[in-house]
C-alpha cells in the first residue's frame, strides 16, 4: 500500500439556514485515509454528504469540526495540487479547445516548451481535429473531455471528480469512464469520484465508500479486488453490485 496522502480526522460539516432558523448536519465525524494510486468511489443516496466531502477536500468549504490534511499539511483553501472536474464542463467560451487545455500552463508561464503536452492531451481524448474549435461548437461529451484533460495537464497529485459524466448519454458516459481510467492508470495519482451509479463506482474504483445520511457518515469501505479492464457481467462484479445495492436498500439485482 502506498503512503497516506489525504486524511480526514473527525470531520463534521453543518450548514445554517438563516431564513428557516435551522441547521443541516451534512457530515458527522468522518475518519478516512486515502493513499497515492487509489481510485476512490463515493456512493450513497442524495443528501448523504458525498459532494460535501469533495468540496472540503477541494478547499472550497471548511469543516465545522475536525481537520483535513494532504501529506500532513492542513487544507485551508483551494490548491492546484487538487484538480477538480465538475459535473458540467466549465470552459472559457472565448478560447479554442487547444487554448482551454493549455490555459493553466499559460497562467504559470509554463506553456512555452510544453506545447507537446497539450498535443498529447488532445490525442488522449481524440480531439486533435477539433483543437481550433470553440466550446460552443462541441457536443456535451466533447466539452466534458476537454474539461477533464484541462484538469489533468498539470498532473495534480489529487484528482477530484464530481459526477463528471452526469449530464452525458449512456454511451458517452462509458467512453468517458475508460478515458478517465486510462489517464489515471498512466499517472497513478489519487483519484476521488462522487457518483450515484453503483456500476460506475465498481467499474472504476479500487475502493467503494458507501455513505448514508442524517448526518452523512461512512457505512462501509469496500476494497474492489478486480483487475482492469473490468467486465460488468462477471460473477465477481455482480457480487459487488448486489452487496452495495443491498447496503443502499435498493435490493440486490436478480
Q: Which ranges hold each PLM region?
A:
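Conserved signature/switch motifs of ABC ATPase nucleotide-binding domains
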Residues: 133-136, 154
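Helix-to-loop junction immediately C-terminal to a conserved catalytic motif
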Residues: 58
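Conserved ABC ATPase "signature" region
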Residues: 112-130, 182
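Conserved ABC transporter NBD signature motif
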Residues: 66-78
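Hydrophobic anchor residue at the start of the ABC signature
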Residues: 148
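The feature captures the beta-strand-to-loop junction immediately N-terminal to the Walker
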Residues: 43-45
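Short helical segment in ABC ATPase nucleotide-binding domains corresponding to the A-loop/adjacent helical element
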Residues: 98-107, 115, 119, 223
